[in-house]
Amino acid sequence: MTNPIHIVGGGLAGSEAAWQVAQGGRTVVLHEMRPVRATDAHHTDGLAELVCSNSFRSDDANGNAVGLLHQEMRSLDSLIMRTADAHQVPAGGALAVDREGFSRAVTAALEDHPNITILREEVAGLPPEDWGSTILATGPLTSPALAEAVGTLTGRESLAFFDAIAPIVHRDSIDMGKAWFQSRYDKAGPGGTGADYLNCPMDREQYEAFVAALIAGEKTAFKEWEASTPYFDGCLPIEVMAERGPETLRHGPMKPVGLTNPHNPTVKAYAIVQLRQDNALGTLFNMVGFQTKLRHAEQVRVFRTIPGLENAEFARLGGLHRNTYLDSPRLLDATLRLKARPQLRFAGQITGCEGYVESAAVGLMAGRYALAEAEGQTLAPLPPTTALGALIGHITGGHVEATEEAERNAPRSFQPMNVNFGLFPPLAQMPRNETGKRLRGPEKAALKKRALTDRARADLAAWMTGERLPHAAE
């Protein structure tokens, strides 16, 4: 008799991983601590409970990265997507679900599966080694005992208990007629060139108006279970810094020293907003020190007053909330195994993905990796041109190593991320219209997204059939 694959955590990632393994013919033991031990966020003991929104976001597979991820997961027999489709409620172009019906259906599917045993018990420490292959999908509200055990194994600094998220901007939406590349004092850090940061200058009037807008902007209240979590020094929301005094920001993350504006070299900026490359492709830049609790609409409004960001498109908006996640690029291998103990895989939000769909997607791949390993097989690497491949690539190696300057302004270089087109390799050629003319504006953006999604579909189909990737040379 073969050993079962153990999965700890019955959320979206754990449920999807269990389904993938069981559908592949292997037995699964799924450990879920609810209702034996409750969390501050969950309200039921159902599997795959949606604790916040009931939305899986856009279902547009041609123009939206998460919609493409929906499509890819459906093609790989995703239980989460199948159940979401069956319990869909009207939500325009988004896929939203009846959350209670959704959770009940996922629970029933797993309870009824002949290859799955569900144990309602807390795994209070690291799983015993005689369990063999195990997937930890314990989410951002991992129980304290298990978080402590993982921290001990990996190094306590490898777990973050308060998640500071700064906005991330698409590089091609920044106005380079106002912004410029330069590191402070032209310092070339490890792997740098001395021109590693994008800089957006402000005069005094612009700065004072910006500070006033930050303070006046509508904030998102902490959830009840977050309110008692203290700030860490590197995680202060930018609006909290602004409230400490009108000059605080220009002596902190917006200090103008060591930088010269080549567009206006004789005038010294009063304050400067810096953006740091966020992914290895150089398509995404994060706003240094701009973690915030401003509501999303307020972030867009206020941050677009920054010179150079008037037309900024955001891959992710900022936030600050209690979370638990691994420094995955340092700790996990390409198949989501813990380097320090390869019997353990991680899946879901604890790996550093953001969002319901992304969590389930990582669970899907963790399940498939574990299944292949149990069968003595090796899955071919996911094409990075696919939504799944781009997401797994970000988690296991798509970050930028932190420089000394970056470490002073952020808790780490790797931070949670939703799937977005900034994680995808650029197209070999930008799309043109029927006459061969280069496009601009909304038409260009729409055709670019369609080209990215068409490429992804072709490459995933080739990966699924083992054929040579048609876009492998790009």
Curated annotation (Swiss-Prot):
* Chain positions recorded as FAD binding sites: 9-14
Q: Which PROSITE patterns match?
A: GIDA_2
Source species, domain of life: Bacteria
InterPro entries the UniProt entry points to:
FAD/NAD-bd_sf (IPR036188), MnmG-rel (IPR002218), MnmG-rel_CS (IPR020595), MnmG_N (IPR040131), TrmFO (IPR004417)
Give the UniProt family note. Answer: Belongs to the MnmG family. TrmFO subfamily.
Question: Which NCBIfam families does the UniProt record give?
Answer: gid_trmFO (TIGR00137), PRK05335.1 (NF003739)
Q: What is this protein called?
A: Methylenetetrahydrofolate--tRNA-(uracil-5-)-methyltransferase TrmFO
